[in-house]
Amino acid sequence: MAVDTDLERRVLDLERILEVTRAIGSTVDLDELLGRIAAAATAVLDCERATVFLLDPERSELSSRVATGMADSPIHEIRFPVGRGIAGEVAATGRNVNISDPYNDPRFNPDFDRQSGFRTTSLLTLPLRGHDGGIVGVIQALNKRGGPFTSRDEVLLATLSAQAGVAVARQTLLEAAALQQRMRRDLEVARAIQQGLLPKHPPDLAGWDVAGWTQPADETGGDCYDWLQVPDGRLMIVIGDATGHGIGPALVSAEARALLRGTATQNQDLPRIVPHVNDLLGEDLREGTFVTAFIGFLDATEGMLDFTSAGHGPILSFSSASGTVTEHATHGTPLGMFPGMTYDPPSRVVLLPGDMLLLFTDGFYEWASPDGTQFGQDRLVDVVTRHRDLPAADIIRLVYDAVSVFARGTKQADDCTAVIVKRTTGPA
């Protein structure tokens, strides 16, 4: 009769373990699944309590995720560092601990008992391991009824701990996949917003061909370009490059663009606009973050373009008469780097029919081939010169194509943005 009873108990234990195994395949919620595992441990081991602790590797802490037998306890969460107490030691060493008299073991921490009024008389603690064998938590059973935990109990709890480890590992993968999907959606939204901030159409200027284009290195980039007809009739032209690439720099460049637009609608005086925007950005940006920028105002009738460089360069102009390219000095400090800075008086370039202003960010110049050689300014100038009779947008596309061929498969490391201002005819 006793044999039959023992056999029945073993069969019941196996059924409970199989029930947990089936639940792993059908239950997505981690807390529900761990709760089933803790309940199964309490029943199979015939003990008063079972707790599942999960490891926070960044903080090197264990925290109780689910527990049985604690409905009347004033403590709802237990959190402690790895290495402290029995559970902390198991998390640190990965070794099972089975103690029949915890209060006579120096590793036992009685603080929880004192706070809750509970009395621990025996405990069995095992690590939870993920797919790679790394420790992801600890499962602990307390106070076996009728005596200390046995070696058979240890085997049974090891089976449950393996299932708990699989559940935690699966949930970690699911959460990582969900996070990646959310980030992908967020990046797509951010990219759409950033693209929406770019000019939709070239400016309507008789005798002029103005084109802009950008290709971020990531989903979003720190480069921007813009143009805006201002109240005095001139065309403001901007190209900017915030440090880095990605969402953070994209926000910085968007703020710089908005500040320049807002300021230019009220004031078209470059010596006042640039320091003002520099100061406003300097208040917002953290140290080490800044925007290099070209800000120019084009008088389309006279062909005069006054500009200030806030750290952006090179600034190039192509002369149709001589077939040569001139590089203009760029002395200004990037926007947002040093609030209170003064800037040199604006420079001026006069564009005659066939002449071009060439603005390219460093993503073009610094894109390297597999041997580390950068595309550089000379190659860029050569492409522009050979295709000078084409529309501005086509020239930009051909430059990017040339850089891509030169790179021979190396990944684009920085955002590539360009603006070309080309005078096609003289004044009427």
Predicted features by range, described:
Residues 61-63, 72-74, 100-122, 143, ...:
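Signal-transducing coupling segments at domain and membrane junctions
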Residues 39, 49-78, 82, 103-104, ...:
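GAF sensory/regulatory domain recognition
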Residues 174, 178-358, 408-428:
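… and, occasionally, acidic/histidine-rich disordered N-termini of signaling adaptors
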Residues 1-9, 73, 130-131, 135-136, ...:
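Regulatory loop-to-helix N-cap segments in sensory/regulatory domains
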